[in-house]
């Protein structure tokens, strides 16, 4: 279902090497390939493809980046029999949603909100021939660097590492009251 063309015994005499090389290229593409897919324009559906025995399919890559200026909500689809995981990047401009789903059915989908211009790790499960699911498995992690108020759900274990503070910074309580302030020393 991801485009690799299986060879039967005695098949493709004289072209076996070429077809095998194409299959190896497909496998390489599936494990780490990158596709920059323009979805520019108004509200529309863009169908990503799988091409058996060929490396030209737009859904036959591990990472797919959506690009272009969008002026309406976008839907990007994959064929029903695809079962893999993707790293998706929304690099579009324009405040519209981008939905990633199977070509038909009412199974689960993954949608980038109008302001979400980030990455998602998704699994295309092909778990139902009529209504298969696509699931976001990003574990809620986005850019930790841009999170100005990260929160822990438990104790912080530094695993024998240090926590470094800038000069005149430290630990405050929930009301902003300073509890520990650290100063940089000369040694």
Model-inferred region functions:
Residues 1-2, 10-98, 132, 162:
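Exposed extracellular interaction/assembly regions and N-terminal maturation sites
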Residues 7:
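Catalytic-domain carbohydrate-binding cleft regions of carbohydrate-active enzymes
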Residues 17-19, 116-126:
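Extracellular disulfide-bonded cysteine-rich modules/repeats
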Residues 24-34, 94-102, 121-140, 181-182, ...:
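Short, surface-exposed terminal/edge motifs of secreted or surface/virion proteins that either
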Residues 28, 33, 140-186:
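Register-specific beta-strand positions within repetitive beta-rich fiber domains
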Residues 68, 102-104, 173:
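Short acidic, glycine-rich loop/turn motifs
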Residues 81-83, 115-119, 168:
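Tight coil/turn sites that cap or link beta-strands
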Residues 105-114:
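Short, aromatic/His-centered strand-loop micro-motif at the edge of beta-sheets
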């Amino acid at each position: 279902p991801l485009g690799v063309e299986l060879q039967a015994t005695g098949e493709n005499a004289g072209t076996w090497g070429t077809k095998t090389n194409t299959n190896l290229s497909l496998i390489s593409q599936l494990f780490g390939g990158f596709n920059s897919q323009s979805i520019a324009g108004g509200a529309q559906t863009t169908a990503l493809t799988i091409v058996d025995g060929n490396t030209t399919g737009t859904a036959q890559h591990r990472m797919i980046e959506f690009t272009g200026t969008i002026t309406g909500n976008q839907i990007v689809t994959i064929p029903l029999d695809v079962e893999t995981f993707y790293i998706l990047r929304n690099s579009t401009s324009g405040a519209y949603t981008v939905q990633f789903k199977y070509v038909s059915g009412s199974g689960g989908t993954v949608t980038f909100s109008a302001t979400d211009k980030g990455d998602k790790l998704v699994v295309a499960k092909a778990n139902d021939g009529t209504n298969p699911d696509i699931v976001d498995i990003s574990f809620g992690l986005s850019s930790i660097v841009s999170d100005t108020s990260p929160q822990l759900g438990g104790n912080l274990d530094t695993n024998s590492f240090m926590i470094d503070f800038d000069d005149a910074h430290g630990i405050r309580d929930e009301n902003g009251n300073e509890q520990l302030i650290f100063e940089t020393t000369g040694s």
